């Protein structure tokens, strides 16, 4: 005989697990954050960056620290990239997207974000834009999400739980 409260406790432990958080972080790409450097104050661009930066979660987990990818989008379609990770720095200019940038830490790929609003797509940039992407270690991000998660049964006799997440970006947690 297994009580419903022990089943709920087991489910809560599964929901709190770092491995489940890791899958969510990897699948949603939450280990990459984008900042619009032209806004004051600077603004996070959750799912609204005109350019998406990609590094596999496996490569990102091996980073010695956070990778900073500063991008300057020109009205001509050219994009200048400056990357910094640890003591290393890389620079490259791309004439068009998609583009790839092999580094010692892995291959960083750049894509136009066709899901963004028409006005912020790379091909519609009318003035120079400055976007910075930060690639973090997915496991560290997953730990942060797991630690920010609050899961509790609604009562002692129910199998319904309330899940809440403390997050500074109200848009991003709606996808979790």
Please tell me what each predicted stretch does.
Residues 174-175:
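Conserved small/polar residues in nucleotide/adenosyl-binding loops
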């Amino acid at each position: 005989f297994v009580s419903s409260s022990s089943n709920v406790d087991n489910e809560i432990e599964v929901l709190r697990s770092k491995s489940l958080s890791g899958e969510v972080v990897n699948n949603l790409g939450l280990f990459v954050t984008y900042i619009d450097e032209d806004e004051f104050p600077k603004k996070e661009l959750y799912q609204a960056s005109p350019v998406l930066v990609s590094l596999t979660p496996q490569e990102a987990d091996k980073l010695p620290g956070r990778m900073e990818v500063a991008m300057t989008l020109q009205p001509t379609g050219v994009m200048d990239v400056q990357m910094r990770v640890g003591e290393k720095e890389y620079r490259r200019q791309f004439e068009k997207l998609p583009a790839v940038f092999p580094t010692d830490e892995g291959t960083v790929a750049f894509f136009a974000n066709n899901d963004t609003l028409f006005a912020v797509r790379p091909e519609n940039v009318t003035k120079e834009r400055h976007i910075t992407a930060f690639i973090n270690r997915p496991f560290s991000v997953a730990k942060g999400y797991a630690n920010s998660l609050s899961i509790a049964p609604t009562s002692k006799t129910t199998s319904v739980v309330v899940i809440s997440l403390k997050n500074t970006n109200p848009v991003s947690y709606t996808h979790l």
